[in-house]
Amino acid sequence: MTTLTAQQIACVYAWLAQLFSRELDDEQLTQIASAQMAEWFSLLKSEPPLAAAVNELENCIATLTVRDDARLELAADFCGLFLMTDKQAALPYASAYKQDEQEIKRLLVEAGMETSGNFNEPADHLAIYLELLSHLHFSLGEGTVPARRIDSLRQKTLTALWQWLPEFAARCHQYDSFGFYAALSQLLLVLVECDHQNR
């Protein structure tokens, strides 16, 4: 990625972690349709590989703003996609895709982090991977830890996530009838792919 700073990429990961970790509340729903978010989306679109995915997400948000009971509908989508059985869902856990659920724990230890007691999900939840990537990008920008060490851990995390993220995103597209979470997963997929290539 050429135009986004490490801190900006960290913010995108943190934002996506939040959206994949719990249902949107009224405040978040208002925020994603705000002028401030439109500016943020414009910044993301300055990164050519992200432009199409951001446009798709903006289209979903525009449709969402005229949807009756948007928050309740999105909550139902979230529940159906991420909290039900895996028959017609996109479970946000590495272990749901036959991946080693212990890998993220090892990566967190290596980063000097641990999961919060406030987050009542297994450690292999997608949001944990995204929070770790956010932390690593912020650390790159601070310069307090050798960049080579952070970058090595970032690459390990991206590799572990990439083992199952494409299937997760495909399942979001398959089962998210409205498309908001499908669009979010597509943005995440492109972001991770770009980040992984930016060695």
UniProtKB/Swiss-Prot annotation:
A Pfam family hit: Nitrate_red_del
Protein name: Chaperone protein TorD
Coiled-coil boundaries: none
Stated family: Belongs to the TorD/DmsD family. TorD subfamily.
Subcellular location, principal: cytoplasm
Subcellular location: Cytoplasm
HAMAP family named among the record's database cross-references: TorD (MF_01150)
GO cellular component: cytoplasm
Gene assigned in the entry: torD
InterPro entries given in the database record: Chaperone_TorD (IPR023069), DMSO/NO3_reduct_chaperone (IPR020945), HscB_C_sf (IPR036386), TorD-like_sf (IPR036411), TorD/DmsD_chaperones (IPR050289)
Keywords recorded for this protein, A-Z: Chaperone, Cytoplasm
UniProt function note: Involved in the biogenesis of TorA. Acts on TorA before the insertion of the molybdenum cofactor and, as a result, probably favors a conformation of the apoenzyme that is competent for acquiring the cofactor.
One BP annotation, GO: protein complex oligomerization
Domain of life: Bacteria
Species of the source: Escherichia coli O8 (strain IAI1)
Gene3D superfamilies, per database record: 1.20.120.1820, HscB, C-terminal domain (1.20.1280.20)
UniProt entry tagged with the keyword Oxidoreductase: no
